[in-house]
Amino acid sequence: YTFNKDGSVFVEPLMMEPEKLELMEQNLMMFYTGTMHSASEILAEQGQNLKNSKTKEENQLKMCSLAKELRGYLQGGKVDLLGEILHENWMLKRTLASGISNPEIDEYYESAMKAGALGGKLLGAGGGGFLLFYVPENRQGQVRDKLRLPEIPLQFDKQGSALIYVGIKPHTVRKERERTEIS
């Protein structure tokens, strides 16, 4: 993806050999940390920090540069470099706002790395949720055993993102909650 200054997004497919794409998919592991976070608070702090700190702005630019670098590696078949770049990116992302990581997340991350992960990151704004790791297949059992977190099966979708209809409108849930609190 390329995010343009006018708010538009340019999507360009990542062209990879099918066997390399399959290897990448096999080596990605996702775990649910069980922790919740406020994405809006983290993103608000991050936005302020980027305005007020040249270092944080440089770190974000480096993250963008790493993504472009990774694209070239993946298209060239160097799939295992994904782990290294995920790691470097995560180290940079942690500097952008105080709530992006916490001691519990740091402990999970360090444990996975010691058990054989080549790199990883917390998905989303930070603070909790899902950890994604790039782990060679022969080390996945050790990572799984060390983390003891619910593992979420991961499979690439070649169709792109899609909206899933749940059947409950957010405002309906809010109104039900308000009725319960009033009673």
Regions found by a protein language model. Name each.
Residues Y1-G120, L132-S183:
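C-terminal nucleotide
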Residues G128:
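Glycine-rich active-site/cofactor-binding loop and its immediate structural neighborhood
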